[in-house]
Curated annotation (Swiss-Prot):
One of its GO terms (molecular function) is RNA binding. GO terms for biological process: regulation of DNA-templated transcription; regulation of RNA stability; regulation of translation, ncRNA-mediated. RNA chaperone that binds small regulatory RNA (sRNAs) and mRNAs to facilitate mRNA translational regulation in response to envelope stress, environmental stress and changes in metabolite concentrations. Also binds with high specificity to tRNAs. Residues 9-68 form the Sm domain. The lineage of its organism: Bacteria, Pseudomonadati, Pseudomonadota, Gammaproteobacteria, Thiotrichales. The keyword Transmembrane does not apply. GO terms for cellular component: cytosol. This is RNA-binding protein Hfq. It comes from Francisella tularensis subsp. tularensis (strain SCHU S4 / Schu 4). Pfam families: Hfq.
Length: 109
């Protein structure tokens, strides 16, 4: 079954590929830190001293240690961008750099 690519997939994939350190805040207030090792539709594998599988429904917020710029129009047809200005202090992530999986069951590694 194919699906419209969400904002989650390109964002998490950029964090994974760039090995960006992240702080993951859970809905119960716990803060986890590490790097996104892999992810699928339901969970994220977070690597620090050990690997942790975190279910997405338990996540409140993901905060990257550095800025990640996404080109939303390439991934989300519902996003309307009024201007295409680039912020030179933000990393550019281009659609051809991202591996978007059409199959919901695939894990990105």
């Amino acid at each position: 079954m194919s699906r419209i690519s969400s904002l989650q997939d390109p964002f998490l994939n950029a964090l994974r590929k760039e090995k960006v350190s992240v702080s993951v805040y859970l809905v119960n207030g716990i803060k986890l830190q590490g790097q996104v090792e892999a992810f699928d539709q339901f969970c994220i594998v977070l690597r620090n001293t050990v690997n942790q599988m975190v279910y997405k429904h338990a996540i409140s917020t993901i905060v990257p240690a550095k800025s990640v710029r996404m080109i939303y129009n390439s991934f989300n047809p519902y996003h309307q961008n009024s201007n295409d200005e680039q912020d030179e202090n933000v990393d550019d992530i281009h659609s051809d750099d991202l591996e978007i999986q059409e199959n919901e069951g695939n894990i990105h590694e």
